Amino acid sequence: MNWIKLLPVAIAGVVLCGCTSILNEEAILNEEAPASSHSEPSVINDRQIVQQMTSRVTEMMDSDSVVEMKDLIEKLKEEPKAKLQLPEVSQSSADEAQKAVAVVGGVYKCNRCPDWHIAPASGFLIAEDLVVTNYHVVDNPERSGLAVRLFDGRMFMVEDVVASSEQYDLAVLRLPKTGVKPVALGPSAPVGAKVSLISHPNRKFYTLSEGRVARYFVTQRNRKPVPAMAITADFGKGSSGAPVLNEQGQVVGIAASTESLYYTEKEGVQNNLQMVFKNCVPVSQLLELIGG
């Protein structure tokens, strides 16, 4: 099973994680997330989002108020639970749900420039000051901090770990109040139910994919059995922590890992890829973690 951890990669000659020149800040803010209308959807500029995150996180990391990653990981490993009173949220469209999806990423310095960078994964708001992602997104001691970028372009540093479970691969993180409408947590989705997912695979920010619940099964984490959910909607590296949504826009799962099935293996080399399983955390485990 391959956990979706973010590493510097290149596609078609474009370096996806590294130094980039910073565009004019005003131009970035004006172009990164244009206002949508009934006739025109929001247009995502991946390159400008990366550059804006680099610029903003460099400013934030230079302040004295950043909670260091080692402190977040220390709290993470305590595996706190919380009895949370979540706000009542009405049914959400895909466009509304998109605004509650966040980029969640560890902050690091490369060896080619003085700037700070973000290794982006995914997450979503369940309250205006609470974001959910995977445990393994936070558990990276090589990072210096943890940043969150909202759909509207604002960025925050994570202040605290409110709840976490390594076995369930979940973390609930505290932010300053954002004023953003969160997504609702729904009931468990039956096998065959239609689902969608909004995530950031390989820095293709706010990509929507659709599919169905394929099955529920038992997997192993830390040598302990734990229920999991598989879906047919595509996701990949950078999608960890993304919300799996039902047709009412409610969260029914959280993207966690992929597992590739190859037909042959010779001398340790796998060949003839047949299919890829997309494994998720069921929403029931998140509800258990936060006392829902």
Could you say what each language-model-derived stretch is?
Residues 134-136, 200, 257:
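Short, surface-exposed secondary-structure boundary micro-motifs
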Residues 98-115, 155, 171-182, 207-292:
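Active-site region of chymotrypsin-like
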Residues 20-22:
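Bacterial signal peptide processing site
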Residues 120, 126-128, 132-168, 175, ...:
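Catalytic-histidine neighborhood of serine endopeptidases
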Residues 26-124, 289:
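N-terminal activation segment of mature serine protease catalytic domains
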Residues 92-93, 159-162, 174-205:
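Active-site substrate-binding loop(s) of clan PA
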Residues 8-17:
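Bacterial N-terminal signal peptides
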Residues 1-7:
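Bacterial N-terminal signal peptides that target proteins for export
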